[in-house]
């Protein structure tokens, strides 16, 4: 049995529309090369809440909360060709999207 090569691409952003847009763009590029693709698989959204004092000296009970969510998508590419990797390297992702690639 032959060992299949696999590439995992994880996209992270604070804006869910950016993640979905670029996940679909990556899928379109990979489909041109006849590689098998799974995804985008939505991973759990993490919410971060930060609490700060409104006043620097008094009124300890007066606080303000800031929250933001980080959205993640996972794309798996099975049996990528050299053309697949070249096309993925040529993609210019926006600064609001963080990309992790594991093979």
Swiss-Prot record:
The keyword Ribonucleoprotein applies. Keywords: Ribonucleoprotein, Ribosomal protein. GO terms for molecular function: structural constituent of ribosome; tRNA binding. InterPro entries: Ribosomal_uS10, Ribosomal_uS10_CS, Ribosomal_uS10_dom, Ribosomal_uS10_dom_sf. It comes from the Bacteria. Pfam families: Ribosomal_S10. Disulfide bonds: none annotated. One of its GO terms (biological process) is translation. Gene3D superfamilies: Ribosomal protein S10 domain. PROSITE patterns: RIBOSOMAL_S10. GO terms for cellular component: ribonucleoprotein complex; ribosome. Belongs to the universal ribosomal protein uS10 family. HAMAP family: Ribosomal_uS10. Part of the 30S ribosomal subunit. Involved in the binding of tRNA to the ribosomes. This is Small ribosomal subunit protein uS10.
